[in-house]
Design a protein with these regions (language model features):
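Polytopic transmembrane helical bundles with strong interfacial aromatic enrichment
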Residues: 2-249
Length: 249
């Protein structure tokens, strides 16, 4: 099993695998998004306290989850890259960062839209909001640093350090509502207690979360293929690819 993981860690092998996966994942993401939006915005009942305004939860919560999950995935690939010096690890980390930054921005934006009618202001110095903003800046810092260093291997190592050190912010985001007295509500879904929302609300949120997962996997597979061609362009196997050979013709 371990040897099979190392087999797919080779850029040449992963290129083919990602090419087979990303169209199916993209189609799945589209289907799940349409289903989630239908359940969340058309079928789910209005909230007893927040009325119709709560429906932004079907976007806000899934993108917030993914902004944290993606950063942890970046830290995982960063550790793998520093430990085993695998070429694919740096590419995976770079491919994840733009999507993570997008989700962090959407989390902050939808949170502001939700917070305005609930709290009467677009922004408060809340522990969860502030730590999510820090996460967004960590993504931007990672992308800026790796883009500023010309040597790819050095850029990957420098970026890996940001990804690993910055990962400490993720549990701070998650536990902030428990550690401090914040305006932000607690966890929308908990594994230790029964759901407090209507079943249709829960299903809408879970469908959207699965859609965000599928989208992330699809776009990362697509982006990694581009990075592989860019970094391995001098190898014989890349030169032999139909898409590369056709572009040169």
């Amino acid at each position: 099993m371990t040897m099979r993981w190392f087999y797919y860690a080779a850029p040449q092998t992963f290129y083919g695998l990602a090419g087979r996966l990303w169209p199916w994942l993209a189609a799945l993401a589209l289907a799940l998004t349409l289903a989630g939006l239908w359940v969340g915005f058309a079928l789910a009942p209005a909230d007893a306290q927040q009325g119709e305004g709560y429906r932004i939860i079907f976007v806000h919560v899934p993108v917030s989850w993914m902004s944290m999950v993606i950063y942890l995935a970046m830290a995982f690939w960063a550790v793998l890259g520093l430990t085993f010096n695998t070429r694919l690890s740096g590419m995976m980390t770079r491919a994840l960062a733009p999507t993570g930054a997008m989700f962090a921005f959407l989390s902050l934006w939808t949170g502001a839209l939700w917070g305005k009618p609930m709290w009467g202001t677009w922004w408060v110095g809340d522990a969860r909001l502030s730590s999510e903003l820090i996460l967004f800046f960590l993504y931007l810092g990672y992308m800026a640093l790796t883009s500023a260093i010309d040597d790819v291997r050095r850029a990957d190592r420098a970026g890996a350090l940001i990804a690993i050190v910055g990962a400490i912010n993720v549990p701070i985001i998650y536990f902030s509502v428990k550690w401090w007295n914040t305006l932000h509500q607690g966890a929308s879904v908990s594994l230790t207690r029964s759901p407090s929302m209507a079943q249709l609300m829960l299903w809408g949120m879970l469908l959207m979360a699965l859609a965000m997962w599928a989208y992330t996997l699809a776009i990362v597979c697509y982006r990694v293929r581009t990075l592989i061609i860019e970094r391995e362009r001098h190898t014989d196997w890349v030169q032999a690819l139909p898409e590369v050979a056709g572009a040169k013709a």
